[in-house]
Amino acid sequence: MPFTGYELHGMEKIPEGPGLIVYYHGALPMDYCYFICNLYIQTGRLCYSVVDHFFSKLPGIELLFNLLPAVHSGRDESVKILKKGNLLAVSPGGAREAFFSDENYNLLWGNRKGFAQVAIDAKVPIIPLFTQNIREGYRTFGKIGFFRWFYENSRLLLIPMYGGFPVKLRTYVGDPIPYDPNITATELVEKTKIAIEKLRDRHQKLPGSILRALLERFDNHQKED
């Protein structure tokens, strides 16, 4: 991807069978779009995407979701997709993480554990995913108190952002967390969070810097997968 010099590392860690991909949500998840495109080009596999219900209400967006393909109808549908042998991806932080996380790349999952229960019910592994510099390409005004108040009271995805910077993006696939019939959803959430934070701490200099992320376009050095 020439605009961001996008790279994908660790594709071989994605199992051939079904799996639930869990990723950190940037202000604008263009890294995830690049990921699913690369996945299809290199393997011919589609990856279903869990999206916010808000988008299903927008005119014409249903057609796009059918092409992706996307899921916004709940846990049961997600389990069915996985049991059919497909890949499914979700960002537990969702819009809140997109708008209100910052250059420290904190995971904002709250008490969400539905994704973990989906993986348990479908008996599939969880594959952690993290993209270096995704927070530097686009940023939001989420630190301004009014916008946090507006979102929490309306749930409308209308928080302004700025950016479009051609920063270096590298997506890293972590080691799958295998299905364990004896684990609880709460425990699996914690294991997944730790796995993504390890990817972040290994591949992302904190706090993030737009200038540094731009300069990394000219730096061929990268941390090992």
Features from the language model and the residues they span:
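Helix-to-loop junction immediately C-terminal to a conserved catalytic motif
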Residues: 1-25
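A broad, low-specificity signal marking well-ordered, structured residues that form hydrophobic/aromatic
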Residues: 6, 19, 47-48, 88, ...
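Short polybasic/polar patches that bind polyanions
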Residues: 2, 66, 120
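Residues that form or immediately flank small-molecule/cofactor binding pockets and catalytic motifs
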Residues: 13, 54, 176-178
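Non-catalytic C-terminal accessory region of glycerolipid acyltransferases
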Residues: 80-225
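Catalytic core of membrane glycerolipid acyltransferases/transacylases, capturing the structured
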Residues: 16-78, 84, 95-110
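Short, conserved catalytic or adaptor-binding loops enriched in Gly and charged residues
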Residues: 1, 63-64, 162-165
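Short gly/ser/thr-rich secondary-structure transition/capping motifs
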Residues: 2-8, 69-73, 154-155
